[in-house]
């Protein structure tokens, strides 16, 4: 029979163990599935969202801008032809809690090569349309988006005559 004597830990052992646990926790969070499909504003982290959302479509019906579409089982945010009003009606009708009220979407505009301001030096329609004044540019330059000001509403995209605005996910989209 083995004796049950207390094991002595040095301070170094304690910190080594804490660092190892911290690294393990970091890698667990890092292994969460990354979002590849834009969800309605306030969508929880993708894995949680998919677990909670029952695909009822109430958010689609509640959206006054018709920018939420049910694709397969889950809702997607589509800002191709209209913008999100960020009215939170989708979150208010969500019976499962998969959507929370939000003041931003998870998307940011990016500007493609064919941007008229960059090529021709005269177009500022996206700047004029932006309700938060998040887009700025110099003549003959590609517009730049201030990520802190941009709410991802999409008002800039439908107005673009060159169809030069595309979407990227914010760096930290998971909640």
Task: Show where each model-derived region lies.
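Non-ligating segments of multi-cofactor redox enzymes
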Residues: 1-175
């Amino acid at each position: 029979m083995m004796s049950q004597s207390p094991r002595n830990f040095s301070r170094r052992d304690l910190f080594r163990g804490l660092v190892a646990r911290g690294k393990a926790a970091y890698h667990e969070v890092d292994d969460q599935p990354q979002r590849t499909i834009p969800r309605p504003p306030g969508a929880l982290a993708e894995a949680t969202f998919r677990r909670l959302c029952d695909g009822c479509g109430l958010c689609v019906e509640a959206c006054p801008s018709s920018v939420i579409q049910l694709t397969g089982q889950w809702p997607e945010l589509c800002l191709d032809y209209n913008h999100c009003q960020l009215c939170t009606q989708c979150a208010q009708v969500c019976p499962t809690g998969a959507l929370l009220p939000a003041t931003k979407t998870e998307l940011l505009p990016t500007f493609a090569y064919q941007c008229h301001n960059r090529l021709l030096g005269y177009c500022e329609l996206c700047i004029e349309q932006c309700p938060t004044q998040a887009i700025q540019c110099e003549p003959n330059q590609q517009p730049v988006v201030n990520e802190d000001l941009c709410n991802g509403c999409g008002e800039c995209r439908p107005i673009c005559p060159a169809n030069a605005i595309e979407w990227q996910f914010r760096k930290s989209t998971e909640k």
